[in-house]
A protein has these predicted regions:
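Aromatic- and glycine-rich peptidoglycan recognition patches
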Residues: 10-12, 94, 121-176
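...with weaker cross-activation on analogous glycine-rich loops/strands in unrelated enzymes
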Residues: 41-44, 79-142
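Aromatic side chains
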Residues: 69-72, 108-109, 154
Length: 176
Protein backbone atom coordinates (compact mmCIF):
# COMPACT_ATOMS: atom_id res chain seq x y z
CA UNK A 1 0.00 0.00 0.00
CA UNK A 2 1.40 3.48 -0.82
CA UNK A 3 2.76 5.48 2.13
CA UNK A 4 0.18 8.25 1.70
CA UNK A 5 -2.64 5.69 1.96
CA UNK A 6 -1.21 4.16 5.13
CA UNK A 7 -0.75 7.57 6.76
CA UNK A 8 -4.26 8.75 5.87
CA UNK A 9 -7.24 8.15 8.10
CA UNK A 10 -9.44 5.37 6.69
CA UNK A 11 -12.23 7.86 5.97
CA UNK A 12 -9.85 10.11 3.97
CA UNK A 13 -8.27 7.44 1.75
CA UNK A 14 -10.85 7.74 -0.98
CA UNK A 15 -11.66 11.43 -0.71
CA UNK A 16 -11.51 13.28 -4.02
CA UNK A 17 -9.60 16.52 -3.47
CA UNK A 18 -9.75 17.58 -7.13
CA UNK A 19 -11.71 20.79 -7.74
CA UNK A 20 -15.17 20.18 -9.16
CA UNK A 21 -16.08 22.12 -12.27
CA UNK A 22 -19.61 23.52 -12.20
CA UNK A 23 -21.91 22.39 -15.01
CA UNK A 24 -22.91 25.32 -17.14
CA UNK A 25 -24.97 23.52 -19.77
CA UNK A 26 -28.62 24.39 -19.93
CA UNK A 27 -31.27 21.68 -20.12
CA UNK A 28 -31.89 22.56 -23.77
CA UNK A 29 -28.18 22.10 -24.54
CA UNK A 30 -28.22 18.81 -22.66
CA UNK A 31 -31.31 17.64 -24.54
CA UNK A 32 -29.67 18.49 -27.85
CA UNK A 33 -26.58 16.52 -26.86
CA UNK A 34 -28.69 13.53 -25.74
CA UNK A 35 -30.55 13.50 -29.05
CA UNK A 36 -27.22 13.10 -30.84
CA UNK A 37 -26.26 10.01 -28.84
CA UNK A 38 -27.30 6.94 -30.82
CA UNK A 39 -29.72 4.38 -29.49
CA UNK A 40 -30.97 3.79 -26.01
CA UNK A 41 -28.10 5.72 -24.42
CA UNK A 42 -29.75 8.93 -25.63
CA UNK A 43 -33.01 7.96 -23.90
CA UNK A 44 -31.19 7.27 -20.63
CA UNK A 45 -29.20 10.51 -20.82
CA UNK A 46 -32.36 12.49 -21.45
CA UNK A 47 -34.13 10.86 -18.49
CA UNK A 48 -31.15 11.57 -16.23
CA UNK A 49 -31.24 15.26 -17.17
CA UNK A 50 -34.60 15.63 -15.41
CA UNK A 51 -33.77 13.96 -12.06
CA UNK A 52 -35.30 15.90 -9.19
CA UNK A 53 -37.88 17.61 -11.41
CA UNK A 54 -41.59 17.51 -10.71
CA UNK A 55 -44.35 17.01 -13.28
CA UNK A 56 -45.19 20.70 -13.01
CA UNK A 57 -41.59 21.74 -13.73
CA UNK A 58 -41.57 19.56 -16.85
CA UNK A 59 -45.06 20.62 -17.95
CA UNK A 60 -46.80 17.26 -17.42
CA UNK A 61 -50.07 16.39 -15.64
CA UNK A 62 -49.48 16.09 -11.89
CA UNK A 63 -51.25 12.74 -11.37
CA UNK A 64 -50.11 9.30 -12.53
CA UNK A 65 -47.44 10.76 -14.81
CA UNK A 66 -44.78 8.04 -15.19
CA UNK A 67 -45.96 7.15 -18.72
CA UNK A 68 -46.22 10.85 -19.59
CA UNK A 69 -42.59 11.26 -18.53
CA UNK A 70 -41.51 8.20 -20.55
CA UNK A 71 -43.22 9.57 -23.68
CA UNK A 72 -41.69 13.00 -23.00
CA UNK A 73 -38.19 11.50 -22.73
CA UNK A 74 -38.61 9.46 -25.92
CA UNK A 75 -39.74 12.54 -27.87
CA UNK A 76 -36.87 14.64 -26.53
CA UNK A 77 -34.40 11.91 -27.47
CA UNK A 78 -35.73 11.89 -31.03
CA UNK A 79 -38.04 8.89 -30.79
CA UNK A 80 -41.75 8.29 -30.64
CA UNK A 81 -43.57 6.95 -27.60
CA UNK A 82 -46.92 5.27 -27.14
CA UNK A 83 -48.80 8.58 -26.75
CA UNK A 84 -50.73 6.90 -23.92
CA UNK A 85 -50.89 7.91 -20.26
CA UNK A 86 -50.90 4.24 -19.21
CA UNK A 87 -47.62 2.64 -18.09
CA UNK A 88 -48.74 -0.73 -19.45
CA UNK A 89 -49.11 0.75 -22.95
CA UNK A 90 -45.36 0.15 -23.23
CA UNK A 91 -45.97 -3.63 -23.08
CA UNK A 92 -46.97 -3.42 -26.76
CA UNK A 93 -44.15 -1.08 -27.72
CA UNK A 94 -40.84 -1.85 -29.39
CA UNK A 95 -38.92 -5.09 -29.13
CA UNK A 96 -39.25 -7.24 -26.01
CA UNK A 97 -35.98 -8.12 -24.33
CA UNK A 98 -35.20 -11.18 -22.23
CA UNK A 99 -33.64 -9.12 -19.44
CA UNK A 100 -32.59 -5.66 -18.29
CA UNK A 101 -30.42 -3.62 -20.60
CA UNK A 102 -29.11 -0.09 -20.11
CA UNK A 103 -31.47 2.29 -21.88
CA UNK A 104 -34.31 -0.22 -22.15
CA UNK A 105 -37.78 0.62 -20.91
CA UNK A 106 -38.91 -1.35 -17.86
CA UNK A 107 -42.61 -1.91 -17.24
CA UNK A 108 -43.62 -2.86 -13.70
CA UNK A 109 -46.61 -4.53 -12.08
CA UNK A 110 -48.70 -2.61 -9.59
CA UNK A 111 -51.91 -3.80 -7.95
CA UNK A 112 -54.87 -3.54 -10.27
CA UNK A 113 -55.47 -4.80 -13.79
CA UNK A 114 -54.43 -1.60 -15.55
CA UNK A 115 -51.96 -0.28 -12.98
CA UNK A 116 -48.23 -0.15 -13.51
CA UNK A 117 -45.09 1.91 -13.57
CA UNK A 118 -42.56 2.60 -16.32
CA UNK A 119 -39.03 3.99 -16.53
CA UNK A 120 -35.60 3.73 -18.18
CA UNK A 121 -33.10 1.11 -17.03
CA UNK A 122 -29.79 2.54 -15.82
CA UNK A 123 -28.34 -0.77 -14.61
CA UNK A 124 -28.89 -3.51 -12.05
CA UNK A 125 -27.88 -4.08 -8.46
CA UNK A 126 -25.99 -7.15 -7.22
CA UNK A 127 -29.17 -9.24 -7.12
CA UNK A 128 -30.30 -8.39 -10.66
CA UNK A 129 -32.93 -5.85 -9.59
CA UNK A 130 -33.25 -3.05 -12.15
CA UNK A 131 -32.08 0.46 -11.29
CA UNK A 132 -34.54 2.72 -13.09
CA UNK A 133 -34.95 6.43 -13.76
CA UNK A 134 -38.67 7.23 -13.81
CA UNK A 135 -41.20 9.97 -13.37
CA UNK A 136 -43.65 10.06 -10.47
CA UNK A 137 -41.42 8.19 -8.05
CA UNK A 138 -41.94 10.19 -4.87
CA UNK A 139 -43.63 12.85 -7.04
CA UNK A 140 -40.36 13.60 -8.87
CA UNK A 141 -38.10 12.12 -11.51
CA UNK A 142 -35.93 9.82 -9.48
CA UNK A 143 -33.55 6.91 -9.78
CA UNK A 144 -34.55 3.88 -7.70
CA UNK A 145 -34.01 0.14 -7.50
CA UNK A 146 -37.13 -1.94 -8.12
CA UNK A 147 -37.68 -5.62 -7.29
CA UNK A 148 -37.12 -7.79 -10.36
CA UNK A 149 -40.21 -9.77 -9.31
CA UNK A 150 -42.34 -6.73 -10.23
CA UNK A 151 -41.03 -6.47 -13.82
CA UNK A 152 -43.65 -7.26 -16.45
CA UNK A 153 -41.31 -6.67 -19.39
CA UNK A 154 -38.27 -4.89 -20.74
CA UNK A 155 -38.63 -3.32 -24.18
CA UNK A 156 -36.37 -1.40 -26.52
CA UNK A 157 -37.90 1.35 -28.68
CA UNK A 158 -38.23 0.09 -32.28
CA UNK A 159 -36.04 2.71 -33.96
CA UNK A 160 -33.28 2.18 -31.39
CA UNK A 161 -33.19 -1.55 -32.06
CA UNK A 162 -32.47 -0.81 -35.71
CA UNK A 163 -29.86 1.84 -34.84
CA UNK A 164 -28.08 -0.54 -32.47
CA UNK A 165 -28.13 -3.36 -35.02
CA UNK A 166 -26.64 -1.02 -37.62
CA UNK A 167 -23.97 0.17 -35.17
CA UNK A 168 -23.08 -3.45 -34.32
CA UNK A 169 -22.84 -4.31 -38.02
CA UNK A 170 -20.56 -1.32 -38.64
CA UNK A 171 -18.35 -2.31 -35.69
CA UNK A 172 -18.11 -5.90 -36.97
CA UNK A 173 -17.23 -4.67 -40.46
CA UNK A 174 -14.44 -2.50 -39.06
CA UNK A 175 -12.91 -5.51 -37.28
CA UNK A 176 -12.66 -7.47 -40.55
Amino acid sequence: MPAHAIAAKPSDRFVNTEPVEPMTRSRSDAAEAAAQVPGAAGVLLEALRWRGSTARQIGLPAKLWCADFMNFVLRRAGGKGTQSRAARSFLDYGKKLDGPRVGAIAIFYRKGLNSGHVGVVRGTDGQGNPIVVSGNHGHTVMQATYPKSKVLAYVMPPNYVLEEMAAAARAAALKN
